[in-house]
Amino acid sequence: MIPRYSRPEMVAIWSPETKFRIWFEIEAYAGEALAELGVIPKEAAKTIWEKGDAAKFDVARIDEIEAVTKHDVIAFLTHLAEFIGPDSRFVHQGMTSSDVLDTTLNVQLVRAADLLLADMDRVLAALKKRAFEHKDTVRIGRSHGIHAEPTTMGLTFARFYAEMERNRARLVAARAEIATGAVSGAVGTFANIDPRVEEYVCEKLGLEAEPVSTQVIPRDRHAMFFATLGVIASSIENVAIEIRHMQRTEVLEAEEFFSPGQKGSSAMPHKRNPVLTENLTGLARLVRMSVVPAMENVALWHERDISHSSVERAIGPDTTITLDFALNRLAGVVEKLVIYPENMLKNMNKFRGLVHSQRVLLALTQAGVSREDSYRLVQRNAMKVWEQGADFLEELLGDAEVRAALSEEQIREKFDLGYHTKHVDTIFKRVFG
């Protein structure tokens, strides 16, 4: 991912230096286990650890060797041998390249998941804070983009919080799904390496041993992981789209923080655009791009092929780096989001009471009018508001058929905003406990 949408904490997980360090640790831990089993000398295992641990792996040198070998793991092992010396013959005993590559990828994905979980905690904290801050800030709810009935800004934040909380649980499950390693040798049969080596290496790396690998770790695990990241990205976009609509000039119920010195347009000095949430909408697309390729990686030939490899070399870093950046950007947007309660009330009153139409409809049915006739009466008066700019309450009070069923007091009572928010505390208790 380009530096513009990257944070150093996540980039470091995918650096060549980090990758080669994990490669070395897998080889060194395997050497320790093999030494305990009497397969290689204990002094050799000690030498591998000491000399390899002190080495500063030269990425350029490894690339130079790979240019000849056309094999990245062999290039690394050749470079490692330059540090270790004669005992390097005991490195990679009974192992295959996938033991190193697949286990390393999963270590990196686990570390990435841990960072993403911390990011989500920041987003959740921001959403919760703003939810309680605006628990009773009334705004119009919209369906199909059209005024529906009153809700509160706090409930808007609360539903995003609940969605992100579900996503966090999904990511915890996806992390567990991906936290496996394999050191099972060619075609995964342990023919030339003891299963206890795999168990030891995985324990040291904080992984579970893959129950059955076929030289590679099954890619359904990775498919679930990246699918989860795609869902999280969609939830980010869900929040971003809401904010973008709320910042429209004719709505202006909320606005991204506009910092001193910020410019909105090279041509129009007056512009204050929702650029951060627009950016988040685009970044969500990039994250979701990884989902289908990850699923297509599940079907491999027989015990293995490398059709998955080129895909994962790209989507592993790009997707996690992008999502990490997006989550932190979203948290910042929510934390600094400017809310305009007065505009919310102004917008809600724009159609002069139409938002109370359902209450009038229900009152008529409860007064003995058929649902069909009740709907006709309410809609007839509502259309006068839409088409003539009339006042809904006044039209109802002047409608003889409506007044035959409902008194003035009964009609006026149906225009109480508090009626629509009376269960906000109940919903908050469900969401926040």
Please name every model-derived segment.
Residues 1-184, 190, 194-200, 209, ...:
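A helix-coil-helix interface module used to build multimeric assemblies
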Residues 133-136, 170-173, 177, 207-211, ...:
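Conserved helix-loop functional segments at active or binding sites
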Residues 189, 204, 209-216, 345, ...:
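A structural signal for small-residue-enriched, beta-sheet-centric alpha/beta enzyme cores
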Residues 110-121, 128, 158-161, 165, ...:
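Short amphipathic alpha-helical segments with heptad-repeat character
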Residues 198-291:
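Acidic, glycine-rich loop-and-beta core segments that form the ion-binding/anion-interacting portion
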Residues 33, 79, 83, 126, ...:
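Generic, well-ordered alpha-helical scaffold segments in large soluble proteins
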Residues 155, 223-231, 359-367:
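Short, well-ordered beta-strand elements within core beta-sheets of diverse protein domains
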Residues 1-18, 55, 66-68, 75, ...:
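Catalytic-core signal marking the mid-to-C-terminal active-site face
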